[in-house]
Amino acid sequence: MAGRVKNVRQVLGEAAAPLTRLAELPGRGVTRVWECAGPPGAETLMLIHGVTFTAELNWGKVFAPLSRDFRVIAIDLRGHGDGIKTGSRFRLEDCADDVAALAEALDITRFVAVGYSMGGMIAQLLFKRHASRLSGLVLCATARNVLGSPIERMAALALPTAAAAIQWNPLLQPMSAEFFGMTLLGSVDDPATARWARAQLRRTTLATAISAVRAVSEFTSHSWIGEVDVPTAVVVTTRDRIVPVSRQMKLARAIPGASVHEIAADHAVCTTAPQVFTPVLLEACWSVEARRIRQQPA
């Protein structure tokens, strides 16, 4: 592997977009990074994918449209795809710190964090932990928390036991996150897309998936999300089976000045119907960019 791993800045400056390589984040590990260069001087969007997905599966169909106006960067989160190897427990805070470390490695002073589902929670944590680096937020199909009802709390209680069973049973460790991921995807009409999605999901282990779902179930930003002071857009998937619309809207209402961009689609529209998702995502990013520019000193 040593011959394939390069410094992040070297990797992303070598070729025209879209470019993907394994790259090293100093002191943290090796991950896969994608970049579309965008126009000279364009604002940077840092794309953060959802649980069990990879950057390619979550964002692959929007790289090119976004890059017409923005510099676009995406990372495989730790434990997912070619992401940094994770330990016995997956932490959203570690993922947020990885994204900030990538920005540091690339000399990116500030960026717009664009997070999808679990990635939206990581984007929220970027504000909490690395606010000086954020120029905006785009939060898609996500919430302040997903663990509220008694049934959801009961389900979450089983996750530590399941994670421990996999950790101590060698026969279970090679199992992939395909089941979890296909549940999130829902119906996929195109057979080629379904095959591609399954192949991507198999690159994440079941143990990581369970640990990540547990981290998502424990996340809450209720006490501090109202402190967000950067331009924010919330993309609401109004037919979502995974994150209730009511929770997505509560997130939007909790953030001062957040714009809402509705899309009549299920949770994984980013993958199952990118032609529907892309215009709404672009609208959300343009909204944040317009407000960011207005806030700049004259």
Residue ranges and their predicted role:
Residues G60, A64-S67, I73-V114:
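Active-site loop/oxyanion-hole signature of alpha/beta-hydrolase fold enzymes
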Residues S221, V230, P244-A252:
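Short alpha-helix in the alpha/beta-hydrolase fold that links the catalytic acid
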Residues G29-D82:
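Conserved HGGG/HGGXW glycine-rich cap/lid loop of the alpha/beta-hydrolase fold
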Residues A258-A298:
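Catalytic active-site module of serine/aspartate enzymes centered on a nucleophile-bearing elbow/loop
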Residues V228, V234-V236, D240:
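Short beta-strand/loop motif that positions the catalytic acidic residue
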Residues T238-V243, A268:
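Acidic catalytic loop of the alpha/beta-hydrolase fold
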Residues G148-R153, N169-G226:
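Conserved alpha/beta-hydrolase catalytic His-Asp/Glu region
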Residues K128, S135-Q167:
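Flexible "cap/lid" loop of the alpha/beta hydrolase fold
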